[in-house]
Curated annotation (Swiss-Prot):
InterPro entries: Scorpion_toxin-like_sf, Scorpion_toxinS_K_inh. Negative results: shows weak blockage on mKv1.1/KCNA1, hKv1.2/KCNA2, hERG/Kv11.1/KCNH2, and hKCa2.3/KCNN3. This is Potassium channel toxin alpha-KTx Ctri9577. Keywords: Disulfide bond, Ion channel impairing toxin, Neurotoxin, Potassium channel impairing toxin, Secreted, Signal, Toxin. Expressed by the venom gland. Residues 1-23 form the signal peptide. Disulfide bonds join 31-53, 38-58, 42-60. Has the structural arrangement of an alpha-helix connected to a beta-sheet by disulfide bonds (CSalpha/beta). SUPFAM superfamilies: Scorpion toxin-like (SSF57095).
Length: 62
């Protein structure tokens, strides 16, 4: 029974992570709160029309 619960919990957590991650791309592009640079990067590289600096990395939002 414990194994079944563990499998279900793992599936639930993975699904939650996937849903949260969908719609934004966390890149390894370094940035210093310069959102303009991130927007340019997101448009050029990922064809996504907006991006912002979070935790010194660019995050692209469609």
């Amino acid at each position: 029974m414990k194994l079944v619960m563990r499998i279900l919990l793992t599936c639930f957590l993975l699904t939650t992570l996937v849903i949260k991650a969908e719609g934004q791309i966390h890149t390894n592009q370094p940035c210093t709160s310069n959102n303009t640079r991130c927007r340019t990067y997101c448009i050029k590289v990922h064809k996504i029309n907006s991006g912002k600096c979070m935790n010194s990395k660019c995050v692209c939002h469609p």
